[in-house]
Curated annotation (Swiss-Prot):
Keywords: Oxidoreductase
Biological function: Putative aryl-alcohol dehydrogenase.
Protein name: Putative aryl-alcohol dehydrogenase YFL057C
The UniProt record lists the keyword Oxidoreductase: yes
Amino acid sequence: MARHFGMALAPWDVMGGGRFQSKKAMEERRKNGEGIRSFVGASEQTDAEIKISEALAKVAEEHGTESVTAIAIAYVRSKAKNVFPLVGGRKIEHLKQNIEALSIKLTPEQIKYLESIIPFDVGFPTNFIGDDPAVTKKASLLTAMSAQISFD
């Protein structure tokens, strides 16, 4: 809908709730007796969060930065026009990393690499009703069960 009507997007939680941290940052946290801030869930990264963090760190290194945060924001901003991620932070360094993302342009290869790390779950309701047929050129399962429609 946003693409169709030319609307902007303001995604939240693009940094995984602070759970996307490099190995170095996690070691530093452990050394200082800090876990990951969390209202619910474990104070350690899940396997998926570790994989994502490692991939973000690899791309960050290619851009000459240690900030997985900047890469995560740059990735989300690269996915569509007019994307304005909601970001936060508790420290000046967080703000600087958020700003750094504005100067990072990911290559198509880097985007493809990041997307290959774990399968993306679009979540409800899109996983129920399907993607925009004007883009995919195919009907969702729900639509296909009710009528034959051409999206050409």
